[in-house]
Swiss-Prot record:
Protein name in the entry: Uncharacterized protein in bioA 5'region
Gene Ontology cellular component annotations, sorted alphabetically: cytoplasm
Family: Belongs to the FrmR/RcnR family.
Keyword Cytoplasm: yes
Length: 91
């Protein structure tokens, strides 16, 4: 079973929390909220997305890169895929 499927409830809860934070940010911008409140909302959204990424990344590494039955070629392919995602995320 995939780690994202196994952790689906937790991941969806995180995504819904992010959605709520993004909606709060949108409301703050629409209502002309104070800069400090808007910045705090942006930081909250960023932190929540980083937490989601960390949770999925940890599951991916544990399930795919640490798999005892993976061939060296499969492991190298998994590393390359992961590095592509990380490079994109860090831009």
């Amino acid at each position: 079973m995939s780690h994202t499927h196994r952790d689906q409830k937790k991941l969806l809860a995180r995504v819904r929390r992010i959605k709520g934070q993004a909606e709060a940010l949108e409301r703050a911008l629409e209502s002309g909220g104070e800069c400090s409140a808007v910045l705090q909302q942006i930081a909250a959204v960023r932190g929540a997305v980083n937490g989601l990424m960390a949770q999925v990344l940890e599951g991916h590494v544990r399930e795919h890169l640490a798999a005892a039955d993976a061939t060296p070629q499969q492991r190298e392919q998994d590393i390359e895929q992961l590095m592509t995602v990380l490079r994109s995320y860090m831009k």
